[in-house]
Amino acid sequence: MKTGYIHRKSMNPCGLRFDSSYHLSDGVAVKRVIASSPYPLMPIEKAADRIFIGGRARRVYVKDREHGIPFLSSSDILQADLEAVKLASKKYTPNVEDMKLQKGWTLITRSGTIGNCAFANAKHAQKLASEDVIRLVPNNILREGYIYAYLASKQGYSLLTQGTFGAVIQHIEPAYVASLPIPVAPESFQQEVDDLIQESARLREEAADALQQAIQQVEDIIPYPSKKNVGCVSSRTILSSHNRRFEANYYISEGHDIEKYIYKNFKWKPLGQVCEDISRPDIFKRFYVQNGIVFLGGADIFLASPDSKKQLSKTKTTNISSLAIKENTILIPRSGTIGNVAWAHAGHAQKLASEDVIRLQPNDILRGGYIYAFLSSSIGKALIQKHIFGSVIQHIEPPHLKLIPIPVIEDSIIDNIHKLVIEYSKKVGKAIENERQAISMIEQEIESWTK
């Protein structure tokens, strides 16, 4: 429990807020540090052309890109994959231009997980975003990468979250963001930070292109069947199936049709044969600490910069070796967003992941990048989802994944797909490194003012 005294005058600048969460937050201490800056201060609104939330509209979703525009929620803007999102109808979505994002903007989540930031790159541009995303459009007074790195720093996060309000669904507002102080650092410092952020954005764009090329090569080889809703299944088929599955969607689904097509038209190997190991850790007692090892959940592995505020004790966690993520491992959640697949790059390495994340370690029979691209494609997703079980909380398990057929295609195509995935992995890893370096420069500079 935190306690403290506040002066009546300190309530005036914050709209006479009376809740203790505002006045006793970390943002208060950060504002004192920022006030001691050796550089001039200005409100962020002076470094921006606009700070706004975009239009609010009734959402009508469609299934094909011909009639829809990718629509990002506040959580989507933080994801590595910006393509696997809902599509808002072009015809029935009003004020589309007000909802579109542009490259170079700083995006801030304003509800739910408040205060998380993303730097809009070319993959965000021209997509729509919900009203739960604050858009900061920089002008030329401060470098756009510098503004982003400042708000994405731990000090920036404390400032953003201090303005939270609401009893049930909490928010921050553009007017509050506009009022936050930002130091006008020397041009050389701003330039160095901006260069790192811009390079990070460029690498992410190139990485996304490389991965999309790899996945497209897989989808060009195997046609995606149209869904059938009815069909006949013999009792012999049911009795000979894995675990004698009885659900209709196991036998009548895209995954089932794709499986039959692969059996008939390709040489193939079950996923269990082309992996050294497919497993997940056992359930364990978690000891959370302040300065431990980062612990990722099933959703965290898909973030553009995989991270979590949860950290596990290094001394009390007995199964660290089985929880640790190894680079070039394939990660699949066993519940939640089943069918999505992540490639463990430098941003994942040596972090821990929960028992809800299945690990696939490819062997030398097929290239790991090819296996990942296949499982990441619409083809692979349908094959994974075929094995879903559970009526309320749905799951898949390693024994089910081992059955998935992996087509054995020409070595040259496999090698090319693998190289593209490795290119994706290296560029994402470097992008995360650059971004963290830029943010760290901001944090260290601010911390130096208290010494």
PLM feature segments, named:
Residues 41-60, 75-103, 269-284, 299-327:
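Sequence-specific dsDNA recognition surfaces
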Residues 57-66, 162-163, 229-233, 283-292, ...:
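Short coil/turn segments at secondary-structure boundaries
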Residues 61-69, 78, 84-87, 99-101, ...:
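Short, surface-exposed loop/turn microsegments at beta-strand edges and helix-strand junctions
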Residues 97, 109-150, 321-323, 333-374:
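A short beta-sheet element
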